[in-house]
Regions:
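Conserved phosphate-handling catalytic cores of large alpha/beta enzymes
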Residues: 268-341, 345, 349
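Non-catalytic interaction/clamp surfaces of large macromolecular machines
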Residues: 4-8, 22-186, 190-195, 240-242, ...
């Protein structure tokens, strides 16, 4: 990809590129395609394009200068492509989700399904846990996704609030043979939950002691008697505490399960760590890590659920755990929402799972940093215009209002050449940014088609582009009272309005319409990671000769 004479196996630069890119994408939220495409384009320019004969240190310096200018532009409150999300506006929230979904064509979602099903599902789920996310910004969002097979369309998907769905069969232990209905048959109501993350095995300590001392005491009869008595004591203590259900991440011995069943206590073991966390949050139970259940364990350590029952979704049965808001007043209990996604197959679910999970995480990130930028290629076109304008000033050095180029620069031949090379580097970066916007035309579009498309976006954004190049001036944005911003609609193959806002007297921007929005932090992170990746490769290329 990056070298004509080398395959991936023997090209050190290509191998380094793939390694760096993989590590960066893992740490990035949702601009993986932007990161991969832009960094690849820049690397091609450095290896065999317009930057091939420019020293790598100058290229790196030029790219970092371009990054600084880009970040300064995006971080300026007067930036014409930037607004803050209005949480009372469904249109703004929908635009952020739409910006994520529109970049994931592999999901195969059509516009009607996106608007009528997917976006409402995500908003409904996020709103249901909004209070928790606000209070616990560093915690993961308690929204669980579940594959409900047997449906050809996502339209049957559902949001289950205050609910955890377990992809497990209903246990039958403890039900007398021939009896169809018992106290442990679903539904089980008003449940008090004991939650364990250990194997309940009284002999474990003795076995560990014997192993560590390299001795083995053969007393099968006495140890068996001790074990069964200890397990019955566990059951008795759980019963006295008022537990009506025992859920465990590890194994609950079959003998104990049967003993608990005689007391009307439901048992479910070998739950995944994710299931245990969700049950703990939903019920408010304290996770128990000692099978003895001594006097320090009180009834308040138990969680509370309204219902444990079965639920059929699609053609599959799940175990459903539900809690009404009034069941328990515990600071440990929190809302948990499950989205049951109907999809024709696991592959389709995985793609939808990624879209929904990313959307929920993005919305959560906007609580602390609500700034977003116009999407669908709009911000790339504006950044390209900004960088070309700055590159011209760099080629003809003079004082720039933000002080990036020092006054009194000695423009001797060497310095002038370096400035020209840096200017060329920044211009190339601008071209690559525009090319990323041009890719919205589709993979089969010609270079001419992309140029025409980019020119159409430029023309539609004429006023905001003018503000972009004059932004360092004090009155760069305040002279206008409103802006309409445009991106590219791949389906209609024409420009579309992605954001419209008015500027209040206090300089606050109020969005009146929003179609496609990207989070500001995500865009800044992607730009930073691109420059870091390409600069790292430039340093490698400066000491590695590829034949």
């Amino acid at each position: 990809m990056l070298s004509v004479a080398c395959s991936i196996g023997d090209c050190p630069i290509t191998n380094a590129y793939l390694h760096i890119l993989k590590s960066k994408i893992r740490n990035h939220a949702d601009s993986g395609f932007f990161l991969a495409g832009l960094s690849a384009s820049l690397q091609l320019e450095i290896q065999e394009g317009s930057l091939e004969h420019i020293p790598h240190r100058v290229v790196s310096k030029g790219l970092h200068l371009a990054l600084d200018w880009s970040l300064q532009y995006l971080e300026d409150p007067r930036c014409p492509v930037r607004v803050a999300v209005n949480w009372s506006s469904a249109a703004s929230i929908s635009a952020v989700i739409r910006g994520i979904i529109s970049s994931k064509s592999i999901t195969g979602l059509d516009e009607e399904t996106t608007e009528a099903v997917v976006i409402p599902l995500i908003i409904q789920a996020f709103v249901s846990v909004f209070g928790y996310v606000v209070e616990h910004p560093s915690e993961s969002v308690p929204v669980q996704l579940l594959f409900a097979p047997g449906q050809a369309s996502i339209a049957k998907s559902e949001v289950w609030k205050q609910t955890v769905l377990l992809d497990l069969p209903w246990p039958c232990r403890g039900r007398p043979q021939g009896v169809k209905r018992s106290a442990l048959s679903p539904p089980i109501c008003n449940v008090r939950v004991a939650l364990f993350n250990i194997t309940i095995e009284p002999l474990a300590e003795f076995e560990e002691a014997e192993t560590s001392s390299n001795t083995r005491i053969y007393h099968a009869d006495s140890t068996d008697a001790f074990r069964l008595k200890a397990l019955r004591q566990v059951g008795d203590r759980l019963d006295r505490l008022g537990a009506t259900a025992v859920l465990s991440q590890k194994i609950v011995p079959k003998y104990l399960q049967t003993y608990l069943a005689t007391k009307g206590i439901f048992t479910l073991d070998r739950l995944s760590a994710a299931y245990i966390r969700n049950v703990q949050m939903l019920s408010g139970a304290t996770i128990l890590s000692d099978w003895r259940i001594d006097d320090s364990i009180v009834s308040s350590s138990l969680g509370a659920l309204s219902l444990i029952t079965t639920q059929t979704l699609g053609n599959k049965q799940f175990i459903r755990l539900h809690r009404e808001g009034t069941v328990v007043d515990s600071e440990n209990a929190h809302p948990v929402t499950t989205i049951a996604i109907t999809a024709p197959d696991r592959f389709a679910f995985d793609e939808l799972n990624h879209v929904v999970t990313t959307s929920v995480k993005m919305l959560a990130s906007l609580i602390d940093n609500p700034d977003v930028v116009a999407g669908a290629g709009c911000v790339e076109i504006h950044l390209a215009a900004l960088l070309r304008d700055r590159a011209k000033q760099l080629r003809n050095p003079g004082p720039i209002s933000n002080g990036t180029v020092p006054r009194g620069t000695q423009t001797d031949n060497k310095a002038a050449r370096t400035l020209r090379q840096m200017s060329q580097t920044i211009t190339t970066f601008a071209n690559c940014l525009e090319d990323m916007a041009g890719r919205l035309c589709g993979s089969h579009a010609s270079a001419t088609d992309r140029e025409v498309m980019i020119e159409q976006i430029r023309h539609a954004n004429n006023e905001s582009l003018l503000a972009t190049t004059t932004l360092p001036c004090q009155n760069g944005l305040s002279e206008r009272k409103s802006y309409d911003l445009y991106g590219w609609d791949p389906r209609k193959r024409s420009t579309m309005q992605v954001l419209s806002y008015t500027i209040q007297s206090d300089e606050e921007k109020i969005a009146s319409e929003a179609r496609i929005l990207d989070t500001l932090q995500s865009k800044k992170d992607a730009l930073t990671l691109v420059i870091e990746s390409v600069s790292s490769l430039a340093r490698i290329a400066s000491v590695v000769r590829v034949s």
